[in-house]
């Protein structure tokens, strides 16, 4: 198995791997994992808010939730922003979630044509790694979402956790990501607080989100794409 890491969707090369993994630790893939683990029937992601609204209009209002975030803040008129702490079983069980975020949804759009598309965050990275190890994938691409096209510490450390568990680092970015995880595994909250996007969230009073997203393997979820942009709880 050859595992390559790309820090942002803009750096993803042409071609298609056997498996592609989208990572947006703060906070889209943490929220997706939490929602599915707590009983959401699906999470449907869109980069464009208008497209999200049009798709959501095809479902009874009582059966859906709309999550919208831009710049770390909830989009006006949406049910929630991009916080995994919102996604309790009381709120999301049995619901189809339509979601658009600043960074993570762009990553999923970039890799949507891979035969197997998964999402990972620190909260479910071990669950995802176990599934990937059980398959006969020759090539795995782990793609960070970054922030508006720039490198992010939090996505890279999560990618590193995957590389550590899968082995087979195929590019320098994968080696560097694994080294970052080795260095910070015991203090992930501090790393996320130091990260530029962590700093943005702290200014918005979202420390609890950072603490939640920094926890390793607290969520049993394997978000897997079944149609372009549609993620459900997969089998592990």
UniProtKB/Swiss-Prot annotation:
Q: Which Pfam families match?
A: 2-ph_phosp
Q: What is its EC number?
A: 3.1.3.71
Disulphide connectivity of cysteines: none
User: What's the cofactor?
Assistant: Mg(2+)
Instruction: Say if the entry is tagged with keyword Transferase.
Output: no
In which domain of life is the source organism classified? Bacteria
Q: What class of enzyme is it?
A: hydrolase
Cite the entry's keywords alphabetically. Answer: Hydrolase, Magnesium
Is Magnesium among the key words of this record? yes
Q: Which GO terms describe its molecular function?
A: 2-phosphosulfolactate phosphatase activity; magnesium ion binding; sulfopyruvate decarboxylase activity
Q: Which reaction does it catalyse?
A: (2R)-O-phospho-3-sulfolactate + H2O = (2R)-3-sulfolactate + phosphate
Q: Which family does it belong to?
A: Belongs to the ComB family.
Q: What is this protein called?
A: Probable 2-phosphosulfolactate phosphatase
Which organism was this protein described from? Gloeobacter violaceus (strain ATCC 29082 / PCC 7421)
């Amino acid at each position: 198995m050859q595992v390559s890491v790309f820090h942002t969707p803009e750096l993803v090369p042409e071609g298609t791997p056997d498996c592609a993994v989208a990572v947006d630790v703060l906070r889209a893939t943490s929220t997706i994992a939490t929602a599915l683990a707590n009983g959401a029937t699906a999470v449907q992601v869109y980069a464009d808010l208008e497209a999200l609204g049009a798709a959501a209009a095809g479902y009874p209002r009582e059966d859906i939730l709309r999550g919208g975030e831009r710049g770390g803040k909830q989009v006006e008129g949406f049910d929630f922003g991009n916080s995994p702490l919102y996604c309790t079983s009381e709120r999301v069980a049995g619901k189809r979630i339509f979601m658009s975020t600043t960074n993570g949804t762009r990553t999923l759009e970039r890799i949507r044509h891979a035969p197997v598309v998964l999402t990972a965050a620190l909260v479910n990275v071990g669950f995802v790694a176990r599934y990937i190890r059980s398959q006969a994938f020759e090539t795995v691409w782990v793609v960070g979402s970054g922030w508006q096209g720039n490198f992010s510490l939090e996505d890279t450390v999560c990618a590193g956790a995957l590389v550590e568990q899968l082995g087979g680092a195929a590019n320098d970015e994968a080696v560097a990501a694994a080294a970052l995880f080795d260095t910070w595994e015991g203090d992930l909250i501090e790393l996320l607080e130091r990260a530029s996007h962590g700093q943005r969230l702290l200014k918005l009073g979202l420390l609890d989100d950072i603490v939640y997203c920094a926890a390793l393997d607290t969520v049993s979820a394997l978000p897997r794409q079944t149609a372009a942009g549609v993620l459900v709880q997969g089998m592990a």
